[in-house]
Structure formats: C-alpha cells, structure tokens
C-alpha cells in the first residue's frame, strides 16, 4: 500500500489523520495518507510533526524510495506500525514555499514570454529562490524590467490551476516543458500541469497558491552571468 498524497489533492491541507504503515530507524516512517511534500523540482520537502498517544515526533525531511519515507528528528520516538497519528505541517514554511514556487513560475512565464529563454536550473528556500536561464545577452535594464513585469502579473491576480493529463496529450500543449531538458521521467504516464491562466503553463509537481495575488511581491535581488550563455536571476518574496 502506497502513501496517498494529500499535498497533491489539496495544498491547503495542514493537519490530517493517518495510520503508520511502517517505521524503522534506518528508513523512517511511512503513512497511509500524508500532506508532506516530499521534495523535488527544486522545492524542498515539508517539515512538521506527528502526534500520537501524547507523544510528538518531529519530521525534518523525507527520503525517496519505493514509498514516501518521513525522517524523524534525531532522538525522537518512532510510532509503531498500525499507530493512529495526527499529522501537522509547519504552516509558515509550507505557505512560504508555495508563494515562492508560484513566484518562480511567474518569473519563468515573464522571461519566456518577453525574451524566449528556457530554464536551465533553479532552486528555492522559503521566500528566496534562484532560476537560471539560457540567455546570451540581456539589456542593461533587464533586472528592473523583469521585476516590474513580474509584479504586474501578480497584481493581475491570475488564477493558478492544477490539472492532470495523459503524457501524450500533455506534450501536445505548446511549450509545456519550460526547461532546456525535459525533466519528466519517461515512466510518468500522467503529467501534472500547473497553469497560471494567461501567463504560464508547464508540467510541475510542486505546491502552489491559488492565485498570483497570494504570492506577495517579487524583488529581483541579483542578476549573475554564469558563463556559457547562462544568466542567474535571484529573487526574494516579500
């Protein structure tokens, strides 16, 4: 039995009931239902707690494998298999990561629309992030232009919609892959699509806010020339 991904069903879930399927010091804890985002696509995993029988087990990370393994803090007790637990995410961290991830999609959409550049890499932490683009040249006022355009899109309060499509159908959507290399594994038959309506549509597995107005404001903190025609844009969400 695999973990049911509540984070994919509804990214606003912060607390839920679950049953422990397995637990070991070597592998971690596997639940039948979990809202912990396991990490991937540049988005770090969630953190939080499991509450059971008056005990509190802190979850500080995840490990990928055949199952979604939750990693407890060192020294915290493990709930035995079969234990009913109450899961709770670190709400501040998750919400910040959702805002940041959606902000990166706005940035990606603006740079692709205005400059035709594809993404070559990226990473994020709560409220800060960087994204690399395949760009040989940029205008002198590029940094200000990008920030202004991103915040204009945020102010439009565009809806952010999530859907799934069969792989063959998804890849018929123009420019559905915004990275220079297709990062969707070949074994993935159902592709998750994140659509900032009217701006950016791409394959993505992360968690997002419901509209661009919920992101806040994007500040372009730094523009770096990484050589070989790559430009790195660093942002902060405020």
Segments the model singles out, each with a brief description of its role:
Residues 1-238:
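Active-/binding-site microenvironments in catalytic and ligand-binding cores
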């Amino acid at each position: 039995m695999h973990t049911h991904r509540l984070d994919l069903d509804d990214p606003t879930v912060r607390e839920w009931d679950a049953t422990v399927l397995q637990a070991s010091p070597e592998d971690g804890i596997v639940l039948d239902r979990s809202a912990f985002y396991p990490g991937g696509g540049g988005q770090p995993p969630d953190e939080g707690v499991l509450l059971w029988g008056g005990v509190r087990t802190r979850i500080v990370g995840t490990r990928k494998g055949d199952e979604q393994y939750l990693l407890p803090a060192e020294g915290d007790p493990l709930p035995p298999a079969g234990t009913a637990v109450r899961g709770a995410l670190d709400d501040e961290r998750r919400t910040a990561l959702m805002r940041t991830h959606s902000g990166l999609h706005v940035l990606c959409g603006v740079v692709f629309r205005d400059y035709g550049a594809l993404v070559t890499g990226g990473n994020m932490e709560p409220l800060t992030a960087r994204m690399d683009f395949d760009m040989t040249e940029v205008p002198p006022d590029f940094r200000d232009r990008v920030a202004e355009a991103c915040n204009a899109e945020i102010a439009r309060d565009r809806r952010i919609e999530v859907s799934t499509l069969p792989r063959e159908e998804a890849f018929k959507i123009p420019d559905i892959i915004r990275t220079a290399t297709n990062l969707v594994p070949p074994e993935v038959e159902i592709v998750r699509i994140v659509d900032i309506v009217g701006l950016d549509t791409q394959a993505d597995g992360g968690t997002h806010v419901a509209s661009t107005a919920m992101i806040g404001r994007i500040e372009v903190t730094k523009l770096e020339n990484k050589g070989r025609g790559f430009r790195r844009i660093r942002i902060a969400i405020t």
